[in-house]
């Protein structure tokens, strides 16, 4: 007796008929398509065994149904893009959704490298320095007056030049007497200490820190011989081309402060009236 060879689902004999094996079990074509065939996204019909099943992200189409949602041209073996569950050819997608290059005004095609800045887009080859016309790419750039500059060109064309070293000032500049300086170039003429953020003074157009200015130019106190800066509200006494700090203007003998008092002189000494009576 001949062994039976039936459809695993409907039990109809498969002798002399077309069948499909699934997990080693045979099915007639009707049962296989009913049970296992994918449904076409476009027409809603099963994709039969005799049809090519085209799939994209767990969705399936008949070959004849796999076309652009707008122009209806076939997408078989062609690049395409998906937008909100719709498949579009590259031309339709670009016309509808792709951004336009800020420079050449042409569409930036899907898959093309582009540069974006403040809501605008450029082809990579169109995003160039306004001065040297070279592509900026991923390098640093500086925008000015709706134009983009690579850093070297910006420094040459727009950055202020330090009055000391004559090089561009890109960050952290100092203005003194309406002239720009690098912070590291604006230093004391004597000790070369940076003056940015420090108190300083000038003589003959040269800047000095307070210590150097006092050492070089300040008058010396006749009492302690230290400089009298005259800066910051420092008070001092001047008499016959000699100067004293207020705290140093005292009687030579009794050390009484003579500020605001009468006094006498004995050679280079100053004396209070009481000590001067014995002269």
Curated annotation (Swiss-Prot):
SMART domains tied to this protein: LIM
Assigned GO CC terms: focal adhesion; nucleoplasm; nucleus; Z disc
Q: Which UniProt keywords apply?
A: Cytoplasm, Isopeptide bond, LIM domain, Metal-binding, Nucleus, Phosphoprotein, Repeat, Transcription, Transcription regulation, Ubl conjugation, Zinc, Zinc-finger
Q: Does the keyword Metal-binding apply?
A: yes
All copies of domain LIM zinc-binding, residue ranges: 40-92, 101-153, 162-212, 221-275
As stated in the Swiss-Prot or TrEMBL entry, residues carrying the post-translational modification Phosphoserine are 238
Q: Name one GO molecular function term.
A: identical protein binding
Instruction: Cross-link Glycyl lysine isopeptide (Lys-Gly) (interchain with G-Cter in SUMO2): give the residues.
Output: 78, 167, 220
- What is the tissue localization of expression for this protein? Expressed in skeletal muscle and heart.
Q: What does this protein do?
A: May function as a molecular transmitter linking various signaling pathways to transcriptional regulation. Negatively regulates the transcriptional repressor E4F1 and may function in cell growth. Inhibits the transcriptional activity of FOXO1 and its apoptotic function by enhancing the interaction of FOXO1 with SIRT1 and FOXO1 deacetylation. Negatively regulates the calcineurin/NFAT signaling pathway in cardiomyocytes.
Q: Which PANTHER family match?
A: FOUR AND A HALF LIM DOMAINS PROTEIN (PTHR24205), FOUR AND A HALF LIM DOMAINS PROTEIN 2 (PTHR24205:SF3)
- Quaternary assembly: Interacts with ZNF638 and TTN/titin. Interacts with E4F1. Interacts with GRB7. Interacts with SIRT1 and FOXO1. Interacts with CEFIP. Interacts with calcineurin. Interacts with FOXK1.
Protein name per the record: Four and a half LIM domains protein 2
**Species of origin:** Homo sapiens (Human)
Q: What is the lineage of its organism?
A: Eukaryota, Metazoa, Chordata, Craniata, Vertebrata
Gene that this sequence comes from: FHL2
């Amino acid at each position: 007796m001949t062994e039976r060879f039936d459809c695993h689902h409907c039990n109809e004999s498969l002798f002399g008929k077309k069948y499909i094996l699934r997990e080693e079990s045979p099915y007639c074509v009707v049962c296989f398509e009913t049970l296992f065939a994918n449904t076409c996204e476009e027409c809603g019909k099963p994709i039969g065994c005799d049809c090519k099943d085209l799939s994209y992200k767990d969705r399936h189409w008949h070959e004849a149904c796999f076309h652009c949602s707008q122009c209806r041209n076939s997408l078989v073996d062609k690049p395409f893009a998906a937008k909100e569950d719709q498949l579009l050819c590259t031309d339709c997608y670009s016309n509808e959704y792709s951004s336009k290059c800020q420079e050449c005004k042409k569409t930036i095609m899907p898959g093309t490298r582009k540069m974006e800045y403040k809501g605008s887009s450029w082809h990579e080859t169109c995003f160039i320095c306004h001065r040297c016309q070279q592509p900026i790419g991923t390098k640093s750039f500086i925008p000015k007056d709706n134009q983009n500059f690579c850093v070297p060109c910006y420094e040459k064309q727009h950055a202020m030049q330090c009055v000391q070293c004559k090089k561009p000032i890109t960050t952290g500049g100092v203005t003194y007497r309406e002239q720009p300086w690098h912070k590291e170039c604006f230093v004391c003429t004597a000790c070369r200490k940076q003056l940015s953020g420090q108190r300083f003074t000038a003589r003959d157009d040269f800047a000095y820190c307070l210590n150097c200015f006092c050492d070089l130019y300040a008058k010396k106190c006749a009492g302690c011989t230290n400089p009298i800066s005259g800066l910051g509200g420092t008070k001092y006494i001047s008499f016959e081309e000699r100067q004293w700090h207020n705290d140093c203007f005292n009687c030579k003998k009794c050390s009484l402060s003579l500020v605001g008092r009468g006094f006498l002189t004995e050679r280079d000494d100053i004396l209070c009236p009481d000590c001067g009576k014995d002269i």
